[in-house]
Amino acid sequence: MKHSSGLIVFDMDSTLIHIECIDEIARLNNRYTKVSAITEAAMRGEIDFAESLTQRVACLEGIKESDLESLFSPIPFNPGAKELIQALQAAGWKTALVSGGFTWFANRVQAALNLDAVVANQLEVADGCLTGKVLGDIVDAQVKAEQLQQLAGHWNIPPDRTVAVGDGANDGLMLKAAAVGIAFNAKPALQAIADYSVNSNNLLEILGCLKQSELIEPVI
């Protein structure tokens, strides 16, 4: 019988949830058109992710932190998110979220799904408002790949028992670092390097990919 446990690392925006949080925040101060255009270019790999994030976050200056709640009540999960995580956890898998998005949202996703770990960018807040800056190092493509490897090491999970799921060009290195890389409703650049592609919004289809890879046979 195959070893049943492993590590699966998810992107957050447009993967576990069906929105791009930074774009939705930008709606709060009428900067959606500008910010979403930069997001699209970054996800296609046309501009550097860290540079794009700095540009986009600068557009959010002055937004009240309390107003973010309206974007996440309820949390906009993609279909099958909870069922997928529950199935994997029941099979002994570690589940993690590694996102170029923000801890304000990622921590809430972690709590709702009972994920084992979360890594994301932290928005700077002063006097209850966003400053337009990110605290600390930016979680970019390289950091995502490194975090997958570090989490696997932390839990003593063999490299050949690791899976990464994402949708954008900044997930490419993470998918390559994993034994199995799954592109979820992804941009063409990511689908081109992924082991499997799911072209629907139902996260439960990821189970089919894992069964094909034999990573979760015969547990689920």
Swiss-Prot record:
Enzyme Commission number, as recorded: 3.1.3.3
Cofactor: Mg(2+)
Pfam families assigned to the protein according to its UniProt record, in alphabetical order: HAD
Enzyme class: hydrolase
Positions of disulphide bridges: none
Pathway: Amino-acid biosynthesis; L-serine biosynthesis; L-serine from 3-phospho-D-glycerate: step 3/3
UniProt keyword Amino-acid biosynthesis, yes or no: yes
GO cellular component, one term: cytoplasm
Residues where Mg(2+) binds: 11, 13, 167
One example of a Gene Ontology biological process annotation: L-serine biosynthetic process
Gene Ontology terms, MF aspect: L-phosphoserine phosphatase activity; magnesium ion binding
Positions bound to substrate: 20, 56, 99-100, 144, 170
Annotated keywords: Amino-acid biosynthesis, Hydrolase, Magnesium, Metal-binding, Serine biosynthesis
CDD domains: HAD_PSP (cd07500)
Active-site residue numbers: 11 (nucleophile), 13 (proton donor)
Reaction equations catalysed: O-phospho-L-serine + H2O = L-serine + phosphate; O-phospho-D-serine + H2O = D-serine + phosphate
PANTHER family from the UniProt entry: PHOSPHOSERINE PHOSPHATASE (PTHR43344:SF2)
Family indicated by similarity: Belongs to the HAD-like hydrolase superfamily. SerB family.
Entry protein name: Phosphoserine phosphatase
Organism: Idiomarina loihiensis (strain ATCC BAA-735 / DSM 15497 / L2-TR)
Gene coding for it: serB_2
